[in-house]
Amino acid sequence: MMHEMTATLSDGPKTAVSPSFGLRLATLSPLETLAQSVSTIAPSTSPTLTVPLVFALAGDGTCLAYALALGLIVLVGLCVARFARESASPGSLYEYTRGSLPPVLAALTAWALFFAYAMTASSVIGGFLNYAYVFLGGLGPRVPAALLACAVAAVATWVAYRDVKISARLMLWIETISVVLIACVVGLTLVRHGLHLDRAQFDLRHISLGRLRLGGMLAIFSFVGFESATTLGAEAREPLRTIPRAVIGSALLAGAFFLVCSYGEVLGFRGAPTSLATSTAPMRYLAARAGISFAGVIIDAGVLVSMFAATLGCVIAASRVLLLMAHNGLAHGRLQQTHHHNQTPGLASIVAGLAALLPALGLVVRGVGGADIYGWMGTLAVFGFLTAYVLTAAALAAHLRRRGRLGSGTAVLTVSAVVAMMVALAANIYPVPEAPYRYFPYIYLAYLAGAALLCRRGLAKFARV
């Protein structure tokens, strides 16, 4: 049963908690709300998969690349948190733009956000496949990649379908254990090198600014999903207070973790026979150099499970965006139904799980490796996230200006966020990257065009809403 909205964004400075849309009310604690954003970021996966990719581009500037990415994400996070203090809804960034931008742009935000979460889930399924074979090695017969992909997607969808509270607790424990273990290895690596500053990582005379820019754009993928706590809406306790804190807190905590890890990994691989850029298990190598080889195996196991947690977090976020889209005519009406007992978006969870599985499964069948799936799907996801981030920052400026509350500080914030994200988006397009990355912008545009064609009738209804 829906609960009446106490206020809307158009009411001025008042705040609002949206209807529950059949979801459980006030079921998640502040820590569990934070867990949604943290698990979608999946901080333990970046030191093992993303940092080596950033190092391949930025070299010794890897830590600076992460500092650049953190600055951009904080700008967007401040815009999102400002909205989250005024309204809580399972529609996330889509709900924020719906009340402030023209219907077409709000619909664009919705479809971009759903695409971003689904592609991120598909990406980490690829990461799961890659790391499963690294971790399992020669233990027993090799399980077919297609079967592994189906298994991780099916279990994540089932948990999301079953209970969001169980999901949040599970994700919190998984990420906490993984992050603590990685922090221990990085800490021992720093101690082993005498805790002195590695000046080479901050000497701009020997760091290519062009490659630093490219590395910084790739480092953004480590942060995407930090805003996913906003998809919980009224499922969180005191959502107007806990959700903004989760958004900013997850970005800052993850950023600090990434800065330390990227610095420690670059330092730890100096003089190593294998480059960080080509290492398949960097934490296992660093653990061995620190004299605690057993920790490397435990970390690999934790990262593997963290990949599952990230898949789960993305399915949860995508299903709730899809739920509100269905309520507003942007998706099939049956997707707005919630399970009568679990009080979760049952059918939307299944659709989100399938949207995550099918791209990864299609690539696996064609013989594409897990690492490539992680990189390719992650790049596609960035297009969706950057689109949603740009429109959310613009929506905040429009929302406050319409109500005469746009101060100079907020104006500078929103303009800075929009410009920063537009630059990041352009960096993924020009200079024209090599194949297959050069085709990804066209795939994304084709997806948006297809969504618009499918929802022509729904767009008219949405405009009336």
Per-region residue spans from a language model:
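Membrane-water interface regions at transmembrane-helix termini and the short interhelical loops
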Residues: 24, 83-84, 108, 130, ...
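Select transmembrane alpha-helical segments in multipass membrane proteins
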Residues: 27-37, 102-115, 148-151, 206-219, ...
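Membrane-interface loop-to-helix entry segments
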Residues: 143-193, 207, 247-251, 384-390, ...
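A generic transmembrane alpha-helix motif of multi-pass inner-membrane proteins
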Residues: 380, 384-385, 406-465
